Amino acid sequence: MIDRIPVPFLNPLFKFLFNREWDGPSTFSILMMIGFLTASYLLPKELKRRKLEPEHSDWLLLLGILGTLVGAKIFFVFEIWDQIFVETPGFDGKYIYPLTHWYGFPGRMSLWDNLFSGSGLVFYGGFLFGILFITLYMKYFQLDIASYLDAAVPSMAIGYAIGRLGCWVSGDGCYGFATNVEIPLLVFNYHGAHPSGVPVWNTPLIESIISFLFFFYFQFWARNQNFKKFSIGAQYLVLHGFARLLVEFLRVNKAVFPLMDPPAFVNIPNAEQNPEFLTQYYWHGFSQSQLVSIIIILVGAFFILKWKLWKKENTSNI
């Protein structure tokens, strides 16, 4: 995996200005920026094509990104909540100390450090807060929320697809558990974390491929079918929800709704450093992302059934 791209001629300047080394921009950040630029190119064109107001595209993108970052961090904190606020011998209370000390309890996950670090992002938190932020913006300016969300779907799909490539290339850890299946690219030997060299499911690439397929579907076919208003948005909720639900069966994630006994190492601190962690891991219950996926699927299906969104408009309105 390639975590960063070195820029040798900038390192001396960075060291002179900030008195520290700089290894170069992260591949994750670069691909996230490419995803943002791609979306910023497509969205105003789609708004204009639909006879909406393209001048809102910049704010929609910026608020979408801001909401994504805020929500992804908040959901990550919820995900590791029981690793932050724990009874620790020698310390008074399990809530006050983590709230008043940046690094929290010694040897434990910290609240503030994780909240403001560059890592630790939960997709569905970002997805929900991103939609919330742009919806509040559209509500404030009295825009047609359903039409604008329809217009944003292709940009959301391509942005997510490129962003997931960043997860894979940088080796940020959102991989699957070990497998003996041999499928080029979809299974790879992970060297970015412990245990090194274990063949695992390449879940970031799997999600990226699926999201690229969604983009092609919405960009080159569905948007030209004259579906009823919000059909595109509702379809995306259902399709993306199903995709995420299924991929999560291959990922290493904590089960918030367990259905069977957990793997032997799952509740041991720093278990990922044990070579047997990934090889003995298995899906043992629904994760936070899977529960949110089910809710999103149901929401999308509700709108499709309630408004009969499989039907097409009688006359073109775009």
UniProtKB/Swiss-Prot annotation:
Protein's UniProt keywords contain Oxidoreductase:
no
TM segment ranges: 24-44, 60-80, 115-135, 198-218, 285-305
Instruction: Identify the metabolic or biological route this protein is part of.
Output: Protein modification; lipoprotein biosynthesis (diacylglyceryl transfer)
What's a GO cellular component annotated to this UniProt protein?
plasma membrane
Asked if the Swiss-Prot or TrEMBL record annotates the protein with the keyword Cell inner membrane, the reply is: yes
The terms under GO molecular function for this entry are: phosphatidylglycerol-prolipoprotein diacylglyceryl transferase activity
Q: Which UniProt keywords apply?
A: Cell inner membrane, Cell membrane, Membrane, Transferase, Transmembrane, Transmembrane helix
Q: Which purpose does this protein serve, as stated in its record? A: Catalyzes the transfer of the diacylglyceryl group from phosphatidylglycerol to the sulfhydryl group of the N-terminal cysteine of a prolipoprotein, the first step in the formation of mature lipoproteins.
Its name, as the record gives it, is: Phosphatidylglycerol--prolipoprotein diacylglyceryl transferase
Which organism is this entry from?
Leptospira interrogans serogroup Icterohaemorrhagiae serovar Lai (strain 56601)
